């Protein structure tokens, strides 16, 4: 699996051609799920993550490491308090993420919200 939790920043591609670096002190991971799959030509790895910015915005993103080894990313920044479900599912569809990954990520996010109250 791609180690997206390292100290190296990951550049997430956002809509409109913008991008953002994550894995810094401004974004706190709330929930994450990952999966890898062996194909004839090697492993494919998916990671889906939900982070909260220090000012409350939410970043939902997916990282795909295909057998080519070229990292692909996509993400969306949502206003504070927005339901993340649609964004998580939309991004998962973009990279054919197995359904257990967005499901687990959403469930972990909801659990984290309940525990923080």
Regions found by a protein language model. Give the residues of each.
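Short, charged/polar N-terminal "headpieces" of proteins
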Residues: 1-38
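Amphipathic, interaction-prone secondary-structure segments
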Residues: 24-58
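Mixed-charge, Lys/Arg-enriched low-complexity segments
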Residues: 66-117
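A short, structured beta-strand/loop element
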Residues: 58-68
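Short, exposed beta-strand/loop patches in secreted or surface proteins that constitute
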Residues: 20, 50-51, 79
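Generic structural motif
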Residues: 17, 53-55, 65
């Amino acid at each position: 699996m791609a180690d997206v939790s390292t100290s190296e920043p990951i550049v997430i591609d956002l809509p409109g051609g913008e991008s953002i670096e994550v894995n810094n002190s401004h974004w706190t991971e709330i929930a994450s799920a990952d999966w890898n799959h062996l194909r004839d030509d090697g492993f494919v790895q998916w990671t889906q993550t939900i982070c909260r910015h220090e000012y409350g915005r939410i970043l939902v993103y997916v990282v795909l490491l295909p057998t080519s080894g070229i990292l692909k990313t996509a993400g969306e920044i949502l206003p504070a308090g927005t339901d993340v479900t649609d964004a998580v599912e939309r991004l998962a569809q973009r990279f054919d993420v197995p359904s257990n990954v967005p499901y687990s990520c959403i469930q972990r996010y909801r659990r984290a919200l309940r525990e923080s109250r």
